[in-house]
């Protein structure tokens, strides 16, 4: 059995423009995240837990978009969207796995900022390199079995009628729409998993930032306040964008009722947000900008 991804076939006149835009954005994501990883690797001032997590986040972003965009570009180029059941399941599994890991990693990054700002004296002990690695491993090991189980549950459903997916990649809502019979249990599972990987992490991040903001307001130094807010604001912007889009997609009452608006929202969190993330982190982060200037100065001399 195979599916057909409709993608953007409803706007054929814009195919080549969309191909050019998405290709440019994909290259920007690869380049910007690659630069962030390189800067953190080679610059001594960036050898801290915060930037260790940021480099892992950048690597996740590269993998996250690579699951979606190259396949989408190929479908636009060939104007065909045929995809086998196995390829569809694999794409969805890896997409959810990487997305879920990003949610947990963003929570870890918020915890890192909480310890750094609210408990600065304990920070070197609490967030040592071993703990950082354990937190990264935990983010992956929690996500992998849950996502594999959910993917198997969805693709064991019987599919009948049309095999066309009104989307540009294999995601849960449009796949559930093709399933036959009662999908109530699957919908409940989707909501439970979404609560675990979206709602709970978001609430933990909100609590962390509530304590961070409360602590920042107690600082007597205006410079200290500005530096603390600058450090945290970029992370908070990314959190709001990413979790907001995820909530709209996976926590709506009927996630399988996924039409044009769902496709636009998916573009937002699969392409637009990953394009903006490196820009947000670099432009609002003085340490990254200083490291970038030093790297450019070395390359130009």
Swiss-Prot record:
Q: Which SUPFAM superfamilies would you find in this protein's record?
A: Family A G protein-coupled receptor-like
Q: Which GO terms describe its cellular component?
A: plasma membrane
Could you list which ranges are Cytoplasmic topological domains?
A: 38-45, 112-130, 209-228, 284-301
Q: Where do the TM regions start and end?
A: 17-37, 46-66, 91-111, 131-151, 189-208, 229-249, 263-283
Molecular function per GO: G protein-coupled receptor activity; olfactory receptor activity
Q: GO terms for biological process?
A: detection of chemical stimulus involved in sensory perception of smell
Question: What is the name listed in the Swiss-Prot or TrEMBL entry for this protein?
Answer: Olfactory receptor 10AG1
Q: Which organism is it from?
A: Homo sapiens (Human)
Taxonomic lineage of this organism? Eukaryota, Metazoa, Chordata, Craniata, Vertebrata
């Amino acid at each position: 059995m195979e599916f057909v991804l409709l993608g953007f076939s409803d706007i054929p006149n814009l195919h080549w423009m969309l191909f050019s835009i998405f290709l440019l954005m994909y290259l920007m994501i690869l380049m910007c995240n690659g630069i962030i990883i390189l800067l953190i690797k080679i610059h001594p001032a960036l050898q801290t837990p915060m930037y260790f997590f940021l480099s892992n986040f950048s690597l996740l972003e590269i993998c996250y978009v690579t699951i979606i965009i190259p396949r989408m570009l190929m479908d636009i180029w060939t104007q065909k969207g045929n995809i086998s059941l196995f390829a569809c399941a694999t794409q969805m599994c890896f997409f959810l796995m990487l997305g879920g890991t990003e949610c947990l990693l963003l929570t870890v990054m918020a915890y890192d900022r909480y310890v750094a700002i609210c408990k600065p004296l304990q920070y070197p002990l609490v967030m040592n390199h071993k703990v950082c690695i354990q937190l990264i491993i935990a983010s992956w090991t929690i996500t992998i079995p849950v996502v594999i189980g959910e993917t198997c549950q969805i693709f064991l459903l019987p599919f009948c009628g049309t095999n066309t997916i009104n989307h540009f990649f294999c995601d849960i809502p449009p796949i559930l729409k093709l399933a036959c019979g009662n999908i109530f249990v699957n919908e409940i599972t989707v909501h439970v998993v979404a609560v675990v990987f979206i709602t709970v992490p978001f609430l933990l991040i909100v609590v962390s930032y509530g304590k961070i903001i409360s602590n920042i307001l107690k600082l007597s130094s205006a410079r200290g306040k500005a530096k603390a807010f600058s450090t945290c604001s970029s992370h908070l912007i990314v959190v709001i964008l990413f979790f907001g889009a995820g909530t709209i997609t996976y926590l709506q009452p009927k996630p399988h009722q996924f039409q044009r608006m769902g496709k636009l929202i998916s573009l937002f969190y699969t392409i637009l947000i990953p394009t903006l993330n490196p820009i947000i982190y670099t432009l609002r982060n003085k340490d990254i900008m200083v490291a970038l200037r030093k790297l450019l100065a070395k390359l130009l001399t």
